[in-house]
Design a protein with these regions (language model features):
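A detector of single, family-specific signature residues
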Residues: 1-391
């Protein structure tokens, strides 16, 4: 086996070639730039190994290896990603205090010898990673949206704290439109009542605002809110950002749902799994065949409980490892909430754990691991969810 280890960087990479059977370094570590010229240099030095049993290894971290991976796959190389935590622990285990690109490239090449440290990358994996970027972007925008909504409420608590006591739906179109025009109590109190009535009118049937102009102006006149122009500007700016981002979120939702219908994955057959949650989990998993069993998948999601035992001491109530993708864990917890609602098996399992004295969050974690076992079975056998076959 010929092992080609590459330590990836932003502007340059370091590569080396190792004969796994003898441990001989066939090509000493050399540097290549992160551009076409550098990629061609790597190919010219390693193309002699394409038709032999070989592996090209890189750490699965960052995004600097994506272009190089695509290039190598086009050239018919066998590419593998190595767990960066494993290389870090191996370096410490060997007592290597020095760290540089050359030593890292050699270490990566050596670690290709052990299957437990790497996963194979194919063209399909790259295509899946592109969809994963879409689902991650969706969740990132949702998180930013929640943060900006909290910022908006903070600002309103200063300039018009009574606003949320009114009977309108918070963050609705009427709510956002009105506040973008009148961001403070002082701006409302001085406005003509007829103009306020017009501002509260919304287009479309069944969307009339329940708040009256008289009601809101009376509150504004007696408001304890401060008249601060900088906060007024902050309110209008945040509302504009929220509205723009909402359009982007809706567009991504549509794209994800279209892809979900096109893919028609068995994961959507699970009661309570939405297109968004299902596709997020699926995008993070990638190729199910890279996992030998459900334990590997649970560990990949960071849902495996930590264990600490030494001699007679055995730590209890240990948390989950939280290794791997936080997006996958978030989607799992969101999905398991509705799955427990619509699936009798999961509902009974959740109730069982609660009756055992488990907290709500702990019981959810047990259900999430059970959900991962079900997902593994459905994806590996390409079968639909059947309530009668779930134990």
């Amino acid at each position: 086996m010929i092992n080609i280890g590459i330590d990836v960087g932003k502007f340059k990479h370091c590569a080396t070639v190792l004969d796994d059977s003898t441990g001989e370094v066939l090509i000493k570590p050399f540097f290549l730039t992160n551009n076409r010229k550098g990629f061609d240099l790597l190919y010219s030095k390693t193309k002699q190994f394409i038709h032999r049993k070989h592996s090209v290894g890189m750490e699965d971290t960052g995004h600097y290896m994506i272009n190089l991976t695509n290039y190598l796959l086009d050239k018919k190389f066998t590419v593998k990603y190595i767990n960066p935590r494993a290389t870090c622990l191996r370096r410490k285990g060997l007592g290597i205090s020095a760290k540089n690109d050359r030593k890292d490239a050699l270490l990566i090449a050596e670690m290709l010898s052990e299957k437990r440290f790497w996963r194979s990358i194919s063209v399909r994996s790259i295509e899946n990673s592109k969809f994963r970027d879409i689902t991650r972007l969706y969740h990132q925008l949702q998180e930013q949206q929640n943060q900006d909504m909290n910022r908006l409420q903070r600002a309103l608590d200063i300039v018009f704290p009574e606003a949320n006591s009114l009977s309108w739906t918070r963050y609705s179109k009427a709510y956002m439109k009105f506040l973008s025009t009148y961001p403070s109590a002082s701006s409302i109190a001085l406005e003509d009542i007829r103009i306020l009535r017009k501002a509260l009118k919304t287009e479309g049937r069944g969307r009339q605002c329940k708040v009256t102009a008289e009601e809101i102006r009376e509150l504004a006149k007696n408001s304890v809110g401060e008249d601060i122009i900088s906060i007024d500007l902050e309110v209008t700016s945040i509302i504009a950002i929220i509205n723009t981002r909402e359009e982007q979120i809706r567009m991504l939702e549509k794209k994800i749902e279209e892809f979900s219908h096109k893919l028609n994955s068995p994961i959507i057959s699970i009661p309570g799994i939405s297109h968004i949650s299902g596709m997020t989990i699926l995008a993070e998993i990638g190729d199910i065949n890279q996992f030998q069993n459900t334990g590997n998948l649970i560990s990949f999601a960071g849902m495996d409980p930590l264990v600490y035992q030494s001699g007679k001491y055995d730590a209890a109530h240990m948390p989950i490892s939280k290794h791997g993708s936080r997006y996958m864990r978030k989607a799992l917890y969101q999905a398991v909430f509705t799955v427990c609602k619509y699936s009798p098996t999961f509902h009974d399992y959740y109730t069982k754990k609660r009756n055992q004295g488990k907290s709500h969050r702990c019981a959810q974690g047990h259900c999430a691991r059970k959900l991962l076992r079900v997902i593994y079975k459905l994806l590996s056998t390409n079968s639909l969810y059947d309530q009668n076959h779930i134990q």
